[in-house]
């Protein structure tokens, strides 16, 4: 590599196949140029992250496979977004994949950048056997309370499916009033590919709704905080009052 410039080496690395990473890491490490040695360190970190992701993907179907082993055939993962905000809806999603589906990067939506969530949103919809999204607005949240509203959103999501699952993996909850076997999994959105995918669909859908509200009520900053109780949001409420999308039951102390 001594005969190549740093720029040329960077261009090679950008198109390098993963199988050749170790070979190039060793070559770059012995280069006398500090900048090239720095590229070796970056490439080694990238390889380490790839290996960690491969290891994670090997375990992310465990709960789905347990369901198949029990004889279930159509397994869905379900999760919600928006239980905590002061404004806007709560959104739930359910996703059904074929057995042993693996999608690189699918994880708890809170651990992903917005750009990555948006990218995976499209991939998940393409890869899923089926998916459903349920939305419950702020007025229903005030009427039924947030927990019941969350269950309502989940049931709406299930009802959007072409075919009901015979087994549901749920993120740390059991949905009442449905005749489907369920497995509540603590931190399921980082342990099950189906729940993780559902968390991404729910989050991206809700964020999209809040972006629309931001155009209607630009002074509240919904685009940035998505309705959560930030300092900016509370200051806007104090200055302008509440909007029709605010959850009054969440604002009893200041109304």
From Swiss-Prot:
GO terms for molecular function: manganese ion binding; RNA binding; RNA-DNA hybrid ribonuclease activity. Endonuclease that specifically degrades the RNA of RNA-DNA hybrids. It is an enzyme of class 3 (hydrolase). Its EC number is 3.1.26.4. It comes from Clostridioides difficile (strain 630). A divalent metal cation binds at residues 79-80, 171. SUPFAM superfamilies: Ribonuclease H-like. Residues 73-255 form the RNase H type-2 domain. InterPro entries: RNase_HII (IPR022898), RNase_HII/HIII (IPR001352), RNase_HII/HIII_dom (IPR024567), RNaseH-like_sf (IPR012337), RNaseH_sf (IPR036397). It holds the Pfam family RNase_HII. Manganese or magnesium. Binds 1 divalent metal ion per monomer in the absence of substrate. May bind a second metal ion after substrate binding. This is Ribonuclease HII. HAMAP family: RNase_HII_B. The keyword Manganese applies. The keyword Repressor does not apply. One of its GO terms (cellular component) is cytoplasm. CDD domains: RNase_HII_bacteria_HII_like. Coiled coil: none annotated. It is found in: Cytoplasm. Disulfide bonds: none annotated.
């Amino acid at each position: 590599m001594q005969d190549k410039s740093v720029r040329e080496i960077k261009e090679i690395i950008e198109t390098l196949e993963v199988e050749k990473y170790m070979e190039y890491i060793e070559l770059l490490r012995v280069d006398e140029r500090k900048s090239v040695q720095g590229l070796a360190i970056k490439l080694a970190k990238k390889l380490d992250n790839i290996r960690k992701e491969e290891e994670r993907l090997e375990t992310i179907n465990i709960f789905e496979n347990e369901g198949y082993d029990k004889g279930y055939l159509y397994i869905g993962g379900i999760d919600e977004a928006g239980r905590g905000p002061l404004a806007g809806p709560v959104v739930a999603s359910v996703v059904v994949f074929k057995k042993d589906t693996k999608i690189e990067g699918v994880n708890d939506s809170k651990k992903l950048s917005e750009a990555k969530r948006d990218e995976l949103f499209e991939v998940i919809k393409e890869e899923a056997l089926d998916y459903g999204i349920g939305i419950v607005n702020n007025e229903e949240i005030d009427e039924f309370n947030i927990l019941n509203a969350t269950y309502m959103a989940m049931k709406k999501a299930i009802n959007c499916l072409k075919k009901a699952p015979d087994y549901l993996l749920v993120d740390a909850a059991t949905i009442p009033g449905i005749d489907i076997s369920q497995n509540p999994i603590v931190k399921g959105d980082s342990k099950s590919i189906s729940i993780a995918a559902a968390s991404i669909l729910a989050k991206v859908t809700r964020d999209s709704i809040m972006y629309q509200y931001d155009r209607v009520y630009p002074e509240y900053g919904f685009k940035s905080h998505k309705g959560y109780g930030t300092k900016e949001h509370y200051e806007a409420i104090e200055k302008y009052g509440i909007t029709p999308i605010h959850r009054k039951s969440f604002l009893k102390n200041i109304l």
